[in-house]
C-alpha cells in the first residue's frame, strides 16, 4: 500500500514538473497567443494603437459590433482613432478610405475551431477580463466639422465627451448613451436604452431613448431641440435658461411637474399637459415627449 501511494505521489510530481515545462515552452513559443487566437470571443491586448487620417476625409462611417465607443475632440485638425488590438483572430478594426469617406468597422463573432468545454470556459474567462480594453476612441478634427457622420455602435457604453459633434446620425444599442461637456449640432442620436446628458450645448438636434428613460442636466438650447423618452424624462436647467427659451412638452400617459433644486422634497407644481409657451421673438425651443412622467427642475443661475 505504501509503495502504491508513493508511486502515485512520484507520478503526480513528475507530471506537474512536465506540465510546468510544457507551459514554459508554450509561453516562449507564443503558444498561449495561438490558443487565444482560437477564441470565438474577442481577447484584447493591453497595448494601444493609433490611426491618423488627414483633412481629405469629409465623411465618417462607423459600425462597431464588439467595441465600446468614445467620441471626443482631437487635439489638432485630424481624425485620430485609438484602440487596443485583438489577440484573437478576426476581431480587429478594419478601415477603408474611399474618396472623401472613411469607413471604420469591426467583425462580428467568428466561428472558432472545436475546442473542449474546459478550454472554451477558460477562453471565455480571459475574454471577459480583457473587456476593459474593448474601447475605441475617435478624436474628431478640432474646429473642422465633417460633412456627415454615421455611427452604429452595439456594445457597452457609448460616450460623447468634450466633443463637437455636427451633422451626425448615431444609433447605439449599448446599455448607456452618455454625453458630457459637448456641443451637438444638426444631429440625431437614438438608442433603445438610457440617455444621460450633462453640460452640453444642443443646436437643432433630436435625441431619443426608444425604450428607456432620459436625464438631461444643464443643457443649452439653440434652435429647435427635441428630447424623447419611452420612460420618464428629467430635464434640469438654470432659471435663466428655463426662462429664456420656449417650451413644448407633452406626456402620453404621465404628468408634468416643475420643481426647484432648493426644495427637492416638495411635490412641485403640476403643469398643464401639454405645456407650451410662446414668447415673442424667441426662436430657441425645447420639445420634450414621453410616455411617462416629465420633471422640470430649475436651478439657480450661475454668475
What are these model-derived regions, one by one?
Residues 1-5:
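N-terminal Lys/Arg-rich, disordered targeting/topogenic segments
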Residues 39-44, 60-63, 79-90, 127-129, ...:
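Short, solvent-exposed secondary-structure boundary motifs
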Residues 47-59, 68-72, 94-187, 195-199, ...:
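Right-handed parallel beta-helix
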Residues 64, 95-97, 221, 251:
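Generic beta-strand structural signal
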Residues 64-91, 136, 140:
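N-terminal beta-strand/beta-hairpin edge segment
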Residues 187-303:
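Short, surface-exposed interaction patches in beta-rich subdomains
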Amino acid at each position: 500500500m505504501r509503495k502504491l501511494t508513493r508511486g502515485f505521489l512520484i507520478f503526480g510530481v513528475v507530471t506537474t514538473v512536465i506540465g510546468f515545462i510544457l507551459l514554459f515552452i508554450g509561453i516562449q513559443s507564443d503558444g498561449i497567443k495561438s490558443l487565444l487566437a482560437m477564441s470565438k470571443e474577442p481577447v484584447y491586448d493591453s497595448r494601444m494603437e493609433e490611426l491618423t487620417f488627414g483633412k481629405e476625409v469629409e465623411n465618417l462611417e462607423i459600425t462597431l459590433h464588439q467595441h465600446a465607443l468614445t467620441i471626443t475632440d482631437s487635439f489638432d485638425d485630424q481624425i485620430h482613432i485609438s484602440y487596443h488590438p485583438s489577440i484573437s483572430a478576426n476581431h480587429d478594426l478594419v478601415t477603408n478610405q474611399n474618396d472623401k469617406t472613411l469607413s471604420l468597422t469591426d467583425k462580428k463573432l467568428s466561428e472558432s475551431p472545436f475546442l473542449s468545454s474546459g478550454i472554451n470556459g477558460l477562453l471565455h474567462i480571459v475574454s471577459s477580463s480583457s473587456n476593459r480594453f474593448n474601447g475605441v476612441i475617435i478624436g474628431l478634427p478640432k474646429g473642422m466639422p465633417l460633412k456627415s457622420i454615421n455611427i452604429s455602435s452595439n456594445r457597452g457604453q457609448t460616450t460623447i465627451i468634450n466633443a463637437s459633434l455636427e451633422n451626425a446620425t448615431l444609433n447605439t444599442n449599448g446599455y448607456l448613451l452618455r454625453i458630457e461637456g459637448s456641443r451637438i449640432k444638426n444631429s440625431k442620436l437614438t438608442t433603445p436604452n438610457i440617455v444621460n446628458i450633462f453640460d452640453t450645448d444642443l443646436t437643432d438636434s433630436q435625441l431619443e431613448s426608444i425604450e428607456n428613460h432620459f436625464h438631461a442636466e444643464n443643457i443649452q438650447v439653440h434652435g429647435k431641440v427635441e428630447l424623447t423618452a419611452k420612460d420618464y424624462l428629467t430635464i434640469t436647467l438654470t432659471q435663466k435658461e428655463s426662462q429664456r427659451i420656449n417650451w413644448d412638452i407633452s406626456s402620453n400617459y404621465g404628468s408634468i411637474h416643475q420643481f426647484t433644486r432648493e426644495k427637492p422634497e416638495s411635490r412641485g407644481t403640476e403643469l398643464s399637459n401639454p405645456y407650451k409657451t410662446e414668447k415673442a421673438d424667441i426662436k430657441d425651443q425645447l420639445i420634450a415627449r414621453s410616455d411617462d412622467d416629465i420633471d422640470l427642475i430649475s436651478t439657480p443661475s450661475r454668475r
